[in-house]
C-alpha cells in the first residue's frame, strides 16, 4: 500500500483522560508535526457499558476534533478486552486454557470461538462502523489488537480440532500412524474417544493443536475484516498490529500467529515494535522485527505501536528517539506511531509511559518528537514508500518454531528458534548487510543470491526439496543445525540426517549432544559452542573448522559444499557472534558488492538504502553510538536531505552521537 506522506503520531484515548483537554493535545500534536492518531481499540466497556446500550460520546469527540485539526485517524475494532457484563453471560466466554479457566480482569482472556462473544463483537463492530464511516478523517481500520487464540482449549475448540483431523485423515489408522500414537498406548481407535488435548505427551499431536490455534487467529481476523469491509470506503485500508515473541521487548517471529496467512485479509501489514534503549539501543530489534513485517507482504508496513518513553528501563537518551524513528522509515515503514500520547493515571500500564508524562506537560520526549515530525513535514516526500531489493533472505517457519518449543535445546526455553533466527539476523546487521525475512513456504527463493535457513527443525519434503533445488541452480545456501530433522508433523525422518539436504550440504550425522567445554575457532576468532552441537562428518563437503575439544575434535563444526552450480554451508553448532561474522565474511568473500560499501562504514554506523517514490536512491547513515562518527562519501555527488546540503565525492560526513544523515543520489 502506497501512501502520499509519512504518517507520524500516537494512540490517543480521550476516555482515559483525567479531564477534557483534547484541544490542547491536538494543538500540541500539530505543532509537533504529527498527523495521525489511533483510537477506539481498547474500551468496549466504554462504548457499550451495558448490553445493547451504546455510548460513542468520546469516540465522536475525538473524530470531530481530528477533523478540526486535520489529523488522520486509524480506528481499531474494540474486541480484545471484553466488558464484565459479557463475561457473565455464559461460563465459557472466558477461555479454558492449558493452565485452567481464565478469570475476568486481564485483557485477551476470552474464547474467540465462542458464538456469544462473536455475536456481540459483530454487533459492536457494526455499531462502531456506523458512526465512524461518516468521517473523512478516518484513513483505515485496525482489526482487534495483537490477536492470539489465547490458548483456548475448551470443549468447543477441541471438538473443532477433532472435526478438522477427521477431514484430514478419513482413515483413523493413517492418523495414528502419522502421529505415532501407539507410543505409551496413546492410540485412538474411535474419534469419539479422542482425549483432552491438554494431557497429551505426544509432541506431534500437541504441535498440530498449536497449528490449529494459529489458524483460529487467521479465521477470526478474516471474519472481522469481512465485517469492516461492508462499511469502509475503498480508499480506507485494513491492517492489524502484529506483535512478536516477547523477551521483555520485541524479539522474533510470533509463535501464536501465522502472520503470513493472517495478513491475507489486510491491505497493509502493521506491527508493534518495542526494544531496549539508552545504553542498550542497538537497532537490532527495529531491523529484525521490521524485516518480518516487511516480508509478510513484501511491501512497506506501518509501525502502529512503538515506545515514546515506554517502560521505565527504556527511557531514551537525547537523540535516540529521533534515530529510532528514522531507523523504522529506513527499514521500509511508512508510519511511526507511539503507544501512546499520554501516560495513564491508573491500572496495569501506568508506568508504560507515553509521549507526555503524567503531568501532561511538554517535556524532552515531546520536544524530540517535534523535531522528527517537522523534519518529516519538510522532507517526508523523499522518504515515503521506500523500496528495497535485498540479495539476502532469512527464512522463518512457525512449524520449526513450534518444534523447538516441543523439543527445546540445552537451555530448555521456549525461545530457542528465535534465538537461532536472531543469531543469523544480528550477524548480518552488524556486517551492514541488509536482508529480508520470508516464509519457509515462499516460492520466490530464486529472487535471492543468498538464502539463510535457521534451525528448520520441522519441514515437509517439498520445503527441503526447494532448498536443494535453490543450491543446485546456483544459489548460496546457509543452513544451521537442527534443520531437516522432522517432517511437518514433528515425525523424525528415519534416514540420513539432515533429510534430503544431506546431499545438498555434502554432510551427515547421526549423533548430537549439548556442548560442554567446546570451542569453535575461525580466522583466529574463537568462541564457546552453545545450545546444541551435531557430530558432523563430510561426504563431499569441505571442513572449514572442527570442534576444539579433546574428544569431538574429529567432527566438523562448519562445512562448505559445492553443489550443482551453487554452494551450501552448514553450521553444526551455535557459537559466538564474532566467530559467526568471521565465517560469514568467508562465505561472502567473493562478493565485494555485498561485503563493502561506498562509505567504508562499519557498525556502529548502520547503512540502509532503497529507492524512493521519486525514483532516486536513498542512503541512510545511522549512528548507533554515543560518539562522533566520520564517514567518507566514495560515491557520486548527492544531497543530504535533512540539512539540504550538497555532499561531493570524497567529502567527509560527521555524525554526532545518535545522529542520522540521509543522502539522496
Give the location of each predicted region.
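Polysaccharide-binding and catalytic clefts of secreted carbohydrate-active enzymes
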Residues: 99-268, 272-279, 283-285
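Aromatic-lined substrate-binding rim segments of carbohydrate-active enzymes
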Residues: 23-30, 38-98, 224-231
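Conserved, mostly hydrophobic/aromatic
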Residues: 10, 29, 37, 66, ...
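Carbohydrate-binding surfaces of carbohydrate-active enzymes
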Residues: 194, 234, 263-665
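N-terminal carbohydrate-binding accessory modules
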Residues: 1-36, 49, 382
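Short, well-ordered coil/turn segments that N-cap beta-strands
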Residues: 4-6, 33-35, 67-73, 134-139, ...
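The substrate-binding groove and active-site-proximal loops of carbohydrate-active enzymes
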Residues: 8-17, 42-57, 103-120, 147-151, ...
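Short, acidic/polar
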Residues: 16-29, 250-262, 317-325
Amino acid at each position: 500500500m502506497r501512501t502520499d506522506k509519512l504518517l507520524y503520531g500516537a494512540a490517543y484515548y480521550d476516555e482515559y483522560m483525567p479531564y477534557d483537554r483534547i484541544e490542547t493535545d491536538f494543538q500540541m500534536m500539530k505543532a509537533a508535526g504529527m498527523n495521525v492518531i489511533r483510537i477506539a481499540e481498547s474500551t468496549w466497556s466504554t462504548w457499550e457499558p451495558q448490553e445493547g446500550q451504546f455510548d460513542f460520546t468520546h469516540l465522536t469527540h475525538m473524530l470531530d476534533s481530528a477533523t478540526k485539526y486535520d489529523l488522520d485517524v486509524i480506528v481499531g475494532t474494540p474486541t480484545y478486552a471484553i466488558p464484565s457484563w459479557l463475561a457473565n453471560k455464559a461460563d465459557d466466554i472466558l477461555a479454558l486454557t492449558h493452565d485452567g479457566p481464565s478469570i475476568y480482569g486481564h485483557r485477551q482472556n476470552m474464547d474467540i470461538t465462542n458464538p456469544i462473544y462473536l455475536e456481540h463483537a459483530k454487533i459492536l463492530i457494526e455499531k462502531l462502523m456506523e458512526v465512524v464511516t461518516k468521517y473523512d478523517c478516518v484513513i483505515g481500520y485496525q482489526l482487534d489488537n495483537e490477536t492470539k487464540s489465547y490458548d483456548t482449549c475448551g470443549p468447543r475448540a477441541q471438538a473443532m480440532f477433532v472435526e478438522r483431523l477427521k477431514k484430514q485423515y478419513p482413515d483413523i489408522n493413517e492418523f495414528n500412524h502419522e502421529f505415532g500414537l501407539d507410543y505409551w498406548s496413546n492410540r485412538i481407535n474411535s474419534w469419539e474417544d479422542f482425549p483432552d488435548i491438554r494431557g497429551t505427551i505426544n509432541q506431534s499431536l500437541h504441535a498440530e493443536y498449536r497449528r490449529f490455534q494459529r489458524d483460529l487467529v487467521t479465521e477470526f481476523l478474516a471474519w472481522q475484516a469481512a465485517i469492516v469491509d461492508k462499511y469502509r470506503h475503498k480508499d480506507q485500508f485494513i491492517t492489524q498490529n502484529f506483535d512478536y515473541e516477547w523477551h521483555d521487548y520485541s524479539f522474533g517471529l510470533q509463535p501464536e500467529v501465522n502472520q503470513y496467512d493472517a495478513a491475507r485479509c489486510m491491505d497493509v501489514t502493521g506491527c508493534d515494535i518495542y526494544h531496549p534503549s539508552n545504553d542498550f539501543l542497538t537497532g537490532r530489534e527495529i531491523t529484525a522485527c521490521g524485516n518480518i513485517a516487511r516480508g509478510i507482504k513484501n511491501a512497506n508496513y506501518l509501525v502502529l505501536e512503538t515506545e515514546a518513553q515506554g517502560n521505565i528501563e527504556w527511557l531514551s537518551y537525547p537523540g535516540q528517539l529521533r534515530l529510532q524513528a528514522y531507523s523504522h522509515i529506513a527499514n521500509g515503514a511508512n508510519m511511526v506511531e507511539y503507544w501512546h500520547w499520554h501516560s495513564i493515571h491508573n491500572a496495569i500500564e501506568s508506568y508504560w509511559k507515553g509521549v507526555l508524562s503524567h503531568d501532561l506537560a511538554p517535556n524532552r520526549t515531546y520536544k524530540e518528537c517535534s523535531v522528527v515530525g517537522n523534519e518529516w513535514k519538510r522532507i517526508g516526500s523523499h522518504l515515503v514508500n521506500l523500496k528495497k531489493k535485498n540479495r539476502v533472505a532469512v527464512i522463518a517457519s512457525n512449524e520449526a518454531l513450534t518444534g523447538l518449543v516441543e523439543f527445546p535445546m540445552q537451555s530448555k526455553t521456549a525461545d530457542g528458534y528465535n534465538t537461532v533466527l536472531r543469531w543469523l539476523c544480528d550477524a548480518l546487521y552488524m556486517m551492514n548487510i541488509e536482508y529480508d525475512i520470508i516464509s519457509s513456504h515462499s516460492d520466490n527463493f530464486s529472487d535471492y543470491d543468498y538464502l539463510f535457513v535457521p534451525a528448520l527443525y520441522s519441514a515437509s519434503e517439498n520445503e527441503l526439496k526447494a532448498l536443494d533445488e535453490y543450491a543446485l541452480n546456483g544459489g548460496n545456501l546457509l543452513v544451521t543445525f537442527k534443520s531437516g530433522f522432522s517432517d511437518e508433523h514433528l515425525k523424525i525422518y528415519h534416514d540420513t540426517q539432515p533429510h534430503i539436504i544431506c546431499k545438498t550440504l555434502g554432510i551427515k550425522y547421526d549423533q548430537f549432544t549439548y556442548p560442554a567445554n567446546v570451542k569453535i575457532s575461525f580466522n583466529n576468532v574463537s568462541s564457546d559452542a552453545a545450545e546444541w552441537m551435531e557430530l558432523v562428518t563430510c561426504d563431499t563437503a569441505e571442513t572449514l573448522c572442527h570442534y576444539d575439544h579433546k574428544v569431538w575434535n574429529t567432527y566438523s563444526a562448519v562445512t562448505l559444499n559445492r553443489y550443482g552450480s551453487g554452494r551450501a554451508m552448514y553450521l553444526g553448532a551455535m557459537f559466538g557472534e564474532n566467530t559467526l561474522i568471521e565465517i560469514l565474511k568467508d562465505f561472502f568473500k567473493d562478493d565485494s558488492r555485498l561485503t563493502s560499501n561506498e562509505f567504508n562504514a562499519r557498525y556502529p554506523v548502520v547503512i540502509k538504502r532503497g529507492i524512493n517514490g521519486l525514483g532516486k536512491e536513498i542512503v541512510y547513515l545511522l549512528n548507533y553510538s554515543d560518539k562522533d562518527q566520520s564517514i567518507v562519501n566514495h560515491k557520486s555527488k548527492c544531497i543530504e536531505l535533512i540539512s539540504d546540503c550538497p555532499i561531493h565525492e570524497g567529502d567527509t560526513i560527521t555524525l554526532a552521537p545518535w545522529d542520522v544523515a540521509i543522502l539522496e543520489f
